[in-house]
């Protein structure tokens, strides 16, 4: 596995985490070394590249092979301490020299095919993103000089199987992995890359013609939408903990309606104005419940019981026992109010709705009738 030429760790919660490199860097290095091997007609076992972020990587070459005017080489993906579905797999490049003066880039076995608009690549093309396309072509051009041409094929024998553990199918990328990476470096625990992947799904939904979107924290929300609302899950996008970011992205893309659907354990934080719901950012679930129960006239005994709870589920049991289940409609309206306050400077803010459900998939509350919301989503 390749050695990184940079060794400054990323510190997260007091722990030093090792950086890695992207599939784009692997493909670039594999293409460069394959081109060099064709020209020099001898095997090369180590290659260096400069990533788009300016970091130099010195990577070990695996499975080098030369046959006439064609060479094949592979680089093993190393995500550092940010292990994902592609970690440890081999990314191959096959380079064939010709006299055309042009460099053509294609995707072979295990590289996904683009089947939907919205990710900035032509339909039917290989899922090799713009930055890796540029770095691959530049590396090969540097190796072969200005006059020669080359056919470059990127492939990954494990790609189709590995892709089943990624978001690719939801993004309309079928049959394999994507060759990605804007910096060439994988930063462990990087929220920005995670947020960008979620936003990309929003972009694809909008490009397909959808104008109304349902944002959910995770898979449970999608199941609720399908089973209890009877709405096509094509409209569902995961927001994870990045509530504010995904709402702003939905506004940027021009969605006219945003429906927040989730368990109170996540969504009640929004009622307190918390738009990043990870517990390391903020909690305040019990405080929020206590405050709104008090506004509804709940007795001190219930407020004390809820305040002493460690989980939302435990608090919900007390709320039900005291007959204050109507708090969930109240909280849903408060959530929508907070969202509209966040978007108060938006020229044409979208309609905002909120639906709260229990772990056993029952509707707890909403800002307006769920049937009404579902009907609009089906328009």
Swiss-Prot record:
| SUPFAM superfamilies listed in its UniProt record | CbiD-like (SSF111342)
One MF term from GO for this chain?
cobalt-precorrin-5B C1-methyltransferase activity
What enzyme class is recorded for this protein?
transferase
The UniProt record lists the EC number as 2.1.1.195
What Pfam families does this protein's entry cite?
Answer: CbiD
Q: Which InterPro entries match?
A: CbiD, CbiD_sf
Matching Gene3D superfamilies: CbiD-like (3.30.2110.10)
Q: Which pathway is it part of?
A: Cofactor biosynthesis; adenosylcobalamin biosynthesis; cob(II)yrinate a,c-diamide from sirohydrochlorin (anaerobic route): step 6/10
Keywords, A to Z, come to: Cobalamin biosynthesis, Methyltransferase, S-adenosyl-L-methionine, Transferase
Q: Which top-rank group of organisms is this from?
A: Bacteria
Keyword hit for Cell inner membrane: no
Question: Which reaction(s) are listed as its catalytic activity?
Answer: Co-precorrin-5B + S-adenosyl-L-methionine = Co-precorrin-6A + S-adenosyl-L-homocysteine
Q: Which one GO biological process term can you cite for this protein? A: anaerobic cobalamin biosynthetic process
UniProt record similarity statement: Belongs to the CbiD family.
- Descriptive protein name: Cobalt-precorrin-5B C(1)-methyltransferase
Origin organism of this chain? Answer: Salmonella agona (strain SL483)
């Amino acid at each position: 596995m390749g050695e990184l030429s940079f060794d400054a760790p990323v510190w997260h919660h007091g722990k030093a985490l090792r950086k890695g490199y992207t599939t784009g860097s692997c493909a670039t290095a594999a293409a460069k070394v394959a081109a060099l091997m064709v020209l020099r007609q001898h095997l090369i076992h180590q290659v260096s590249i400069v990533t788009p972020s300016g970091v130099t990587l010195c990577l070990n070459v695996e499975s080098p092979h030369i046959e006439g005017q064609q060479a094949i080489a592979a680089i093993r993906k190393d995500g550092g301490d940010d292990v994902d579905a592609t970690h440890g797999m081999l990314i191959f490049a096959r380079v064939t020299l010709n006299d055309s003066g042009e460099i053509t880039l294609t995707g072979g076995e295990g590289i996904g095919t683009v089947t939907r608009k919205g990710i900035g690549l032509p339909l039917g093309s290989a899922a090799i993103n713009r930055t890796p396309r540029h770095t691959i072509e530049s590396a090969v051009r540097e190796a072969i000089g200005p006059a020669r041409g080359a056919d470059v094929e990127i492939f990954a024998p494990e790609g189709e199987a590995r892709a089943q553990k990624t978001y690719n199918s939801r993004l309309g990328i079928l049959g394999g992995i994507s060759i990605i990476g804007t910096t060439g470096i994988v930063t462990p625990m990087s929220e920005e890359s995670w947020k960008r992947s979620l936003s990309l799904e929003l972009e694809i939904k909008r490009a397909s013609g959808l104008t109304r979107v349902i944002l959910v924290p995770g898979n449970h929300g999608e199941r609720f939408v399908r089973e209890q609302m009877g709405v096509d899950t094509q409209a569902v996008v995961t927001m994870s903990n990045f509530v504010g970011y995904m709402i702003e992205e939905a506004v940027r893309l021009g969605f006219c309606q945003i429906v927040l659907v989730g368990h109170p354990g996540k969504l009640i934080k929004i009622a307190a104005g918390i738009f990043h719901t990870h517990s390391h950012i903020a909690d305040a679930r019990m405080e929020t419940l206590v405050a709104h129960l008090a506004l509804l006239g709940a007795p001190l005994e219930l407020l004390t019981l809820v305040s002493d709870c460690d989980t939302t589920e435990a608090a919900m049991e007390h709320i039900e026992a005291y007959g204050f289940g109507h708090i969930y409609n109240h909280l849903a309206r408060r959530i929508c109010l907070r969202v509209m306050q966040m978007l108060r400077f938006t020229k044409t803010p979208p309609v905002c709705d909120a639906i709260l459900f229990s772990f056993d998939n029952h509707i707890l509350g909403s800002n307006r009738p769920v049937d009404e919301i579902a009907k609009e989503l089906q328009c």
